């Protein structure tokens, strides 16, 4: 096989598929984030009843993102989506300080789940465009993220509305999928 045919074969190689689970409390901005990633209109978003799935191409990956509703009545069903998750993205409303304890409890429970053990986690500290938003460093400290030892993790400031910080988070995702799958 000549060099040219090898290059053609590499070029036509399909993107590596990655299963991403997008979780967080209701109104954290998960669906807005997903639509921002897919370059879709974000002006009319309603609470997710059940789930949304979108595939997004990024850096040689086909990211299959499962956006699961965050209302309290839906959260018990989250576990039905854990299987074969490559990356967990957890979205926090940085401006809703009254719910930091609740979101911290939910995240801690997710990190204890056997089916999610060792799965890299990206925490998006969303809504940074709001004046009342807590900085990512304060959220990381409040959630004791420094105690996470069984997986790689990252907290990323972002605004799903403006798109700021979203690409930085997705770059981290693509880097860590590669590291995990080697």
Curated annotation (Swiss-Prot):
InterPro entries: ARL2/3, P-loop_NTPase, Small_GTP-bd, Small_GTPase_ARF/SAR. The modification Phosphoserine is found at residue 5. Keywords: Cell cycle, Cell division, Cell projection, Ciliopathy, Cytoplasm, Cytoskeleton, Disease variant, Golgi apparatus, GTP-binding, Joubert syndrome, Lipoprotein, Magnesium, Membrane, Metal-binding, Myristate, Nucleotide-binding, Nucleus, Phosphoprotein, Protein transport, Transport. Gene3D superfamilies: P-loop containing nucleotide triphosphate hydrolases. Changing residue 31 to N: Enhances the interaction with RP2. Found in a complex with ARL3, RP2 and UNC119 (or UNC119B); RP2 induces hydrolysis of GTP ARL3 in the complex, leading to the release of UNC119 (or UNC119B). Interacts with RP2; interaction is direct and stimulated with the activated GTP-bound form of ARL3. Interacts with SYS1. The GTP-bound form interacts with ARL2BP and PDE6D. Microtubule-associated protein. May interact with GOLGA4. Interacts with GGA1; the interaction recruits PKD1:PKD2 complex to trans-Golgi network and is required for ciliary targeting of PKD1:PKD2 complex. Interacts with DNAAF9. This is ADP-ribosylation factor-like protein 3. GO terms for cellular component: centrosome; ciliary basal body; cilium; cytoplasm; cytoplasmic microtubule; extracellular exosome; Golgi apparatus; Golgi membrane. The keyword Ribonucleoprotein does not apply. The gene is ARL3.
């Amino acid at each position: 096989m000549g060099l040219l045919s090898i290059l053609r074969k590499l070029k036509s190689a399909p993107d590596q598929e990655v299963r991403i689970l997008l979780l967080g409390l209701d109104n954290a901005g998960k669906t807005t984030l997903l639509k921002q990633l897919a370059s879709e209109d974000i002006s009319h978003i309603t609470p997710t009843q059940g789930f949304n799935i979108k595939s997004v191409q990024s850096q040689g990956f086909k990211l299959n993102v499962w956006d699961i509703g965050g209302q309290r009545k839906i959260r018990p069903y989250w576990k039905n989506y854990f299987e074969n998750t490559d990356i967990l993205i957890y979205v926090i409303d940085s401006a809703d300080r009254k719910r930091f304890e609740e979101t911290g409890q939910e995240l801690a429970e997710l990190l204890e789940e056997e089916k999610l053990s060792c799965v890299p986690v990206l925490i998006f500290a969303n809504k940074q465009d709001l004046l009342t938003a807590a900085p990512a460093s304060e959220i990381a400290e409040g959630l004791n993220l420094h105690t996470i030892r069984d997986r790689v993790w990252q907290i990323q400031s972002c605004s799903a509305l403006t798109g700021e910080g979203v690409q930085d988070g997705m770059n981290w995702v693509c880097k860590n999928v590669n590291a995990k799958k080697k």
